[in-house]
Amino acid sequence: MKEGLAKTTPPGVGGDRIEACSYPESESLFFKRTLGRDDLEPIHDDRAENYIVSYSLVSKRREVEQILDRIHHLKCENEPVKWPGRSAVVRTQIDEILSNMAKPDCRSFRWNQHYQSALAQLKAEMMQAHLKPLCLSAVAETETFRKNLKKNAGFMAFETGKRSKGENLDEALRLAEASESEDVMRRHFCKPLVVAIRTSNSGISDWQAGTWKERTRPILMVDLRQLLQSSRFGVPFNDWFQSHVSWGEGGMTHQQVEQWTWKARTRFRHWLSTDFSKYDSSQSSWLIEDAFSVVKAAFPGLNTHEEGLFETIVNSYIHKEIHSYNGIWRVNKGTTSGEIWTYTINTIIHRLIEVTIFSMMGIKRYESLLCGDDGLTYYDGELDLAKYGSLITRYFGIAVSMGKSTYGSAR
């Protein structure tokens, strides 16, 4: 905590919430390195449902207060932009995600030879891609980007009052290009994430039962300007990743998945589907950095500016300022939903964990199909499942529920 600010707990709020929203002096190196400044001061938001002390850059203070006023107005006027606060269940989910992201990293496991070998293996696989980043105008014309123009523009929607990406696209392109050199110099886009809620229907099991169950979950909306820059690398990489990586499920049809499963069952003796707990929000910064180093291996021959832009994308992905219903959180770990990298980084991290732990436990023959934290692995050999889960938790800081995981004999 900054000197002079008492660490008090708001009514009904856990003590770690305050630590999550404050930024200790000992950790201000990030701002000196990436933003070139360390002029932080507290902002008090008495409109939050739980009074909380939060921080923002002094230069951004007026802007933040204006945005909070607009968010408050949207809540009262029931505008199309969704803002959580009505449902205690959703608020609890948001608090759990942000509290987990605010926890310290688990100790780095980079020193381990099995992990180093797994990382080198994935990088070698990506080196076959030989990709090049897109320019901003080309990103806006891709099918991946065009099909999402009706979705929310993130923080920019509150700035302009226009909800969708399509309504903000021209202005976002202009602003992203104008600020690119400054963003790269700071190694950060300085665009906060906004918490929203998404309601969707469940799938096959509900269809069989004749009912459609709605599921509401929080998501973190990335600013459109940052998304445009991230997509310069993300769009070409995701397209290649989904069509060339054998262990990635993305892009496969149901028939292809069934065909893969049928073949794997005839070749291996056992199968395993691991259930991770709080997978996205538990990922340490060093693990995310290494996952992005795997991505970078697919882009050989980057010039100095492109190297800086990629580092800016990684830095902004890891070190996040999140505007929630109860204040501003600053976190330095975890993967966010609503990002172009969400599926890719989650899947690469899953693969890194799996290859490392299987190597440690002597499992040499296996095949996997992974999609983020979900996956199905067929393998030969004897695997101590309890030890398998405990090693993942110990070395990667991600909890595994073996009671919810499914496994069995393939024959």
Task: Give residue spans per PLM region.
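Viral RNA-dependent RNA polymerase
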Residues: M1-R411
